[in-house]
Every structure is written in structure tokens, then in C-alpha cells.
Amino acid sequence: MSSVLAAYEQFLQTTEDRGFGDQQFVQSDTLKAEIPVFVLNTNDPQQRFTLMNFCLRQAVSSSAKSAIKQGALLSLLSLQATSMQNHLMIAARAPDAALRIIEVDAIDPPDYTLTINPRSGWDDIKIRAYRALSRDLPISLADRTVFVSRDAEHAVCDDMDTYLNRIFSVLIQVWIMVCKCMTAYDQPTGSEERRLAKYKQQGRMLERYQLQTDARKIIQLVIRESMVIRQFLVQEMLTADKVGAYTNRYYAMVGDIAKYIANVGMSAFFLTLKFGLGNRWKPLALAAFSGELVKLKSLMSLYRRLGDRSRYLALLESPELMEFAPANYPLLFSYAMGVGSVQDPLIRNYQFGRNFLNTSYFQYGVETAMKHQGTVDPKFASELGITDEDRVDIMQSVEKHISGKAGDDISQPRSAFTMSLNRSAFITNNNPQDLSGARLSNYEQGWSGIDQDETRDTLPESTMHRFQNIDSTNSDHNELQMPEFENDINPFNHPRFTARAPLIPEISHQTPTIRMNRNVNIRDSTRDDRQDANEDRSSNIPDDILGDLDN
């Protein structure tokens, strides 16, 4: 039997192995679109700054074709190099690249009229056409410029230090748009603004040369559509990673942003390793996990064999990326997401509510994480010399502060209640259809499918003590026990509690006979008060008015 299991493990590794560089297989050339790129033959800062603005306008132009926008971005990414043409040779090695080098002798700042070297073979018609493209900006851009500041485009640039600050401010924004270009480009997450604020604080980006939001989105779509640009960017990130700590300003910036781009599209795989295998808890010994553990082992071997490019599989559109999809290990993925929802408050930003999410193993992961929040690793404790008394003290301290809290509750300030309420305890009877079409939260999707009668059996032990005072037949008593939630279509939001007026004691604790007699007395007294009020009102009417009515 052991030989069969070993053969199965080898079989999985063989199915994921791929041989690269085999001389027997040569890919056929495909048709390519010609990409015009501009190369400036001078290092004059004013000329380079003007070409930078010209390339930005070409990249966001409403009339420019895709190849023209791609060439403008490649030219923009090479404006920091001493020799632009040598730097563009990195992009020329791409299989789909058909670059046409356009040598520019000079460019006029006011209207972006190009002076093309005769070797490029351009006539006045193309020069006028590109000048018209640079003027045709989208109507969504304010002040007819790509920058937030309206006067930034036509500022004087007479020294190299000023030019470098401006070109790096623009390039760092282009690199920021690479982070989400292949995964969640149409989902605003706020990460873009946080990274812009980070580089402003570090002094790497000038706020005056911040691009407008619509301009950045257009640039992101150009990067998403172009394999040539993405292969060029991957090569730049690999270069920044290999040069080490002592590097120039540009590659230091690229190496920093590359940390955000690495392993994009593989979050499910790494989160499963972190929360599923990293804790080394006993549930990994389940027989249901045995097959998926072998799969994860083969995937880790595949990741190492792919080398440096394994971090950028999404940018390169590599077919190996499909091997790391969580559908290949659904049970371990569901269990890991349950553990992560308790341990990491930021896991709620990750959309793990997939069709293959197993709610039973998700709930089991939640219970396992809650059970182990106060435990101590025996091996590491022995290395630190922790005694049994210290271990008990540590477990009690942890249990005191975070026991019974979900991952979202740990990061929030303490409320007016002595104990924070776990959202998993307040599961309503509402069906998913009752939420007016709103998407269920990750945590609610994980707890979906549980009947109200089964809630007490499936919830973790740390939350069960909250139901001990609710089992009462008195409806008034039940209303006093539970706080009233504000109306919110998303039950996963943090509950805010409103003060509930107490019931009147003399009404709620009287017998029906006493209540009926009390109501009769109230009606009689009310009728007498109305009669007295009518008599007083009639006595206050003036006599002349009564006389006129009699006549």
C-alpha cells in the first residue's frame, strides 16, 4: 500500500513538471502590431520633460490606438535611462514585440511638435497627426491636462535634478497601477491611495505631479492589454531584485514596489499554507486532508522549480498559475479560511466566498482557531524555559483578552459592554434572498446553511455562555435580554447598540383583571375631562357673537 501512495505522489509531481527550452519544439511566429517608440537623442532636461508630457498625453489620448499607447508607455518607462534605445532593447526581446524606433531630435514644448531625425522616415503628415493625438484628451480629465495641478505640465525644467524628481514621481504612479492590473483592476480597495500617500511621505513622489485618477486608470488598462509591457516590467523587477541593496534610485523604487506585485493572483495558495499548514495543529491529521496535503507538497515543489519568475505568473499569463487555484485543494482551503477569519482581521478583505467553499470545514477551522487562541507550543516553550506556572499564566491572560472574539473584533476598540459580542452568535433566520440582492459577507457565507436549532451545537464553546439567559418563556424578559440592532442590510457590520426603554413595571406585572379595571377608570376620567373642557370653552365665547347667531 505504501508503494501505491508513493507512486501517487510521484504521479502528481510528474503531471506538473514541464520541460523548458526543448530544441525539438519551436513556436511559430504570429502576426504582430508595430509599436512606435520615441527615443530622444539628447539629455537636455527640458527636452526630456517635454517628451514625458507628450508620452503621457499619447497614453491617455481618446483617439490613439492601442499600439500607439503601448509605445508611449514604453518610451515613458525609458526616459530615466541614459541611453533610451539600449533600455528599450529589453522590451524588444519579447516574442510579440515589433518595435519601431522613432528618433526625436527636438520637441517644441508649447504644442508638442516633433522634430524627427531623417533616419526614421517620418513625414509632416505623421508629425501633425501625433500632435493632434496629444491634444485629444478624454473629457473626464479636468483642465485639459493629465496632472491634478493645472500648471504642472508647462513648468520650466532647467536642471537635471528637477527633471529626475518629476520623472520619478510619474514613473512611481505607473508602477503602482501594475499591482492590481491583472487581478482586481475594477474593484476600488483603497490600496492605491495608501501607496501614493506612502511614497509622498517618503519624498519619492511630488504631489504637484500626481496624475488624475482617470488618467491612472487608462494607463492601467493599457498595461493590462499589453503582454510586451508586462514582460518588460517583469524583467525590470528581476533586475532590481538581483542588483542588491547598493543600486540607483530608480531600481530601488522598482524593488520596493515589486514587493506588492510579487505572487499576485496566488493569495489563496499562500493563505492556505499560512493558516492551514503553518500552525501545525492536529486537524491536519484528518484523513480527508491527506490527498490535498500531497497536492500542496507538489505545488510547493513546482513553485521552487519555476525559479524567479514564479512570483510573476499572473503578469506573464503563465499556464502554471491554474495549478495553484484553490479548487485543487478545497477542503484545506475552507479550513484555512476559517482559521484565518479568527486570527487575521485583514482576512475580511479577501473574497474567499467561492462556490467550492465547504462550510463544514470552514466552521471547523473557526472552532479550531478559537480553541487554540490560548494554547502554548510545547516545543517552543521548552526552548524558552517556560514553566508550568508560566504556561498557565500565559493561557489565562490570552483567554481573558481575546477569548470568544472573531478576527474583526480583535482589531476594534472595546465597547461599553464588559465582553465583546461575537457576531457568529447572532445568526438570524433570514435567508440569503432576504438581503435585497446584497452580496453576503465572507463570514456569513461560511456560516450559511445552518438551521437555527443547530446553532447551539455548531457554535464554539467560548460563545455558548451568552445564550444561557435567553431560554425564557416570558417575551418581555427576552426583549430585555437582547440589545436591539440598528437596521443594516449587511449583518457582518459591527453592531451598534441603541438604548432600549424599559417596560413599565405596573403594567407588565399586573393581572388581566387589574389591567382591565385600570383601563376602564382611565376612559371614564378622560370622558369627564373632555366634558369640563367643552363647558369652559363655551363659557369663554363673547356675548356679541352669541347674539348674532340667535338673530
Swiss-Prot record:
Region (Disordered) residue spans: 508-551
Entry GO terms, CC: helical viral capsid; host cell cytoplasm; ribonucleoprotein complex; viral nucleocapsid
Signal peptide residues on this chain, from the entry's feature table: none
Name of the protein: Nucleoprotein
Function of the protein: Forms the helical nucleocapsid (NC), protecting the genome from nucleases. The encapsidated genomic RNA serves as template for transcription and replication; encapsidation by N is coupled to RNA synthesis. Forms the encapsidation complex with the phosphoprotein protein P. Before encapsidation, the newly synthesized free N protein, so-called N0, is chaperoned by P.
Subunit and interaction comment: Homomultimer; forms the nucleocapsid. Binds to the viral genomic RNA. N0 interacts with the phosphoprotein (via N-terminus); this interaction allows P to chaperon N0 to avoid N polymerization before encapsidation. Interacts as N-RNA template with the phosphoprotein (via C-terminus); this interaction positions the polymerase on the template.
The entry's keywords: Capsid protein, Helical capsid protein, Host cytoplasm, Ribonucleoprotein, RNA-binding, Viral nucleoprotein, Virion
Region entry Ncore, spans: 1-404
Family: Belongs to the paramyxoviruses nucleocapsid family.
Domain notes: Ncore is globular and carries the regions required for self-assembly and RNA-binding. Ntail is an intrinsically disordered monomeric domain in the C-terminus.
GO molecular function terms noted in the UniProt entry: RNA binding; structural molecule activity
Main location: virion
Stretch list, region Ntail: 405-551
Composition-biased stretches (Basic and acidic residues): 524-538
Taxonomy, superkingdom: Viruses
Localization per record: Virion; Host cytoplasm
